[in-house]
Amino acid sequence: MSVAFAAPRQRGKGEITPAAIQKMLDDNNHLIQCIMDSQNKGKTSECSQYQQMLHTNLVYLATIADSNQNMQSLLPAPPTQNMPMGPGGMNQSGPPPPPRSHNMPSDGMVGGGPPAPHMQNQMNGQMPGPNHMPMQGPGPNQLNMTNSSMNMPSSSHGSMGGYNHSVPSSQSMPVQNQMTMSQGQPMGNYGPRPNMNMQPNQGPMMHQQPPSQQYNMPQGGGQHYQGQQPPMGMMGQVNQGNHMMGQRQIPPYRPPQQGPPQQYSGQEDYYGDQYSHGGQGPPEGMNQQYYPDGHNDYGYQQPSYPEQGYDRPYEDSSQHYYEGGNSQYGQQQDAYQGPPPQQGYPPQQQQYPGQQGYPGQQQGYGPSQGGPGPQYPNYPQGQGQQYGGYRPTQPGPPQPPQQRPYGYDQGQYGNYQQ
């Protein structure tokens, strides 16, 4: 065997032709087979000899490929032939793989490599999600694509929730809404983390990118929420279950995010969430806490706001959403009804002052909402109007806290209505 292979190899050196190279590749396949057979039989001496021969052939082919690029064009097809053997041969023939990688790489490495990256991207996007996040930065669209699919998968991963935040890119937002829907549902489990990620990311990313877009989303989305509010309710419920979970769990994040952005992004979700919250039994339960405590919880949470700073954000967020949202909704509803959503927000801020820490956020709301406020009006209008039904109960700004409960009730009812 060694002689047979050696001769062709020597001839190949003299004859750099496609036929000679192809024959050498065939010989390499035979060598790989022989190596595998010898390994299976435990003939280490023969295996080592074959490996050395194979390594020599690969080095020679690599040299030819380097000297003659045309050979590379010829090699790719053959390498694929070698590749099948490659896995066994490469693993088994330690030395050859490097040369092989040199020769084969175009096929094996490249073919394998790129797929791996794609695989990784998908894997990362889906599994790691964090990679997604990086990816997200690079390719929101891809992320959206990935997120769409990833969210679906990620939804299972929940990290996707975080990846919704990847979705959060405003582009994602629509998807996010949808994805959130999908994710939110899956995310419900992961919701907290996703929301944590999402909210932070969304808040930041969306706030950064979409804030308006989110708001646009809200506007569109708000409308979507109005139209989609049921979905939002679902999303909110799902996501917001997550958000709720995420909100409370995320609260730490929110607080950072309490910067209105995330709250906004969150708020969208939170609006949906809160609506969903309302929609969601737990949120309602929590909201119900708000309900029973609702006013108290409002007061409670307001106190707890300081305490629950984060939970406040969420609950506050909820309250922001409810209070803030409701206030925003109620106020914003008022604001929505009245152009003064921001005015509503200032009241919210005023309310928030009671809530403490919100004023800034509320301020964030005021300003951000000022922008989004109009957009939120979509929410409020959609939901606000729904709240509007509730507003009658909320009519007095004094009620904002009540509106908050109403917000919850409304949010919940909003969800129900939605």
From Swiss-Prot:
The modification N-acetylserine is found at S2. Keywords: Acetylation, Activator, Nucleus, Repeat, Transcription, Transcription regulation. One of its GO terms (cellular component) is nucleoplasm. InterPro entries: SS18_N. It is found in: Nucleus. Sequence repeats lie at residues 344-356, 357-369. A motif (SH3-binding) lies at residues 392-401. Residues 394-403 have a biased composition (Pro residues). Residues 344-369 are annotated as: 2 X 13 AA imperfect tandem repeats. The keyword Transcription regulation applies. Residues 309-318 have a biased composition (Basic and acidic residues). A motif (SH2-binding) lies at residues 50-53, 374-377, 413-416. GO terms for molecular function: transcription coactivator activity. Residues 76-118, 199-418 are annotated as: Disordered. Pfam families: SSXT (PF05030). Belongs to the SS18 family. Appears to function synergistically with RBM14 as a transcriptional coactivator. Component of SWI/SNF chromatin remodeling subcomplex GBAF that carries out key enzymatic activities, changing chromatin structure by altering DNA-histone contacts within a nucleosome in an ATP-dependent manner. Interacts with MLLT10. Isoform 1 interacts with RBM14 isoform 1. Isoform 2 interacts with RBM14 isoform 1. Component of the multiprotein chromatin-remodeling complexes SWI/SNF: SWI/SNF-A (BAF), SWI/SNF-B (PBAF) and related complexes. The canonical complex contains a catalytic subunit (either SMARCA4/BRG1/BAF190A or SMARCA2/BRM/BAF190B) and at least SMARCE1, ACTL6A/BAF53, SMARCC1/BAF155, SMARCC2/BAF170, and SMARCB1/SNF5/BAF47. Other subunits specific to each of the complexes may also be present permitting several possible combinations developmentally and tissue specific. This is Protein SSXT.
